[in-house]
Amino acid sequence: MFHSVQEYVSKCETCQRTKSTTLKPTGLLQPLPIPCQVWDDITLDFIEGLPCSQGKNTILVVVDRLSKSAHFMSLSHPFSAKTVAEKFINGVVKLHGMPKSIISDRDPIFISKFWQEFFKMSGTQLKMSSAYHPQTDCQTEVINRCLEQYLRCFVHQWPRKWHEYLP
């Protein structure tokens, strides 16, 4: 069965256009400690540069490090730290409570004074990934890649309708 699936995928035109190849990461990886509880430790990232769909062109990706469960929220560029915080509260905190720690890249939103104070007041620890080392937050990068491939497969003919297919 494995060979049948492999052969089918190798001949699928949509798969060939939208799927990316994966490579083994270079160097020694130092994994982050495993969280103890679901939605206590999360990661945040943006997928930017999307075509405008219903006025939105960015996706905020929030991933739970333990369960690998994710939330995707669309945003309009330009957005502020306050707008992102409101989306985060309405889309994640209301459902799962406030996390104990957040890992994110060094996006200007995540290093803004507002964002720092917001999480300081809530008792959430902010952790930044190393500059130019996305493998620190590899799990979110994998989720981003999967979401991008999913959207490409469904909207390759109508790229301005990605918002309708956002899970």
Question: What are the language-model segments listed below?
Answer:
Residues M1-P167:
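Integrase module of LTR retroelements
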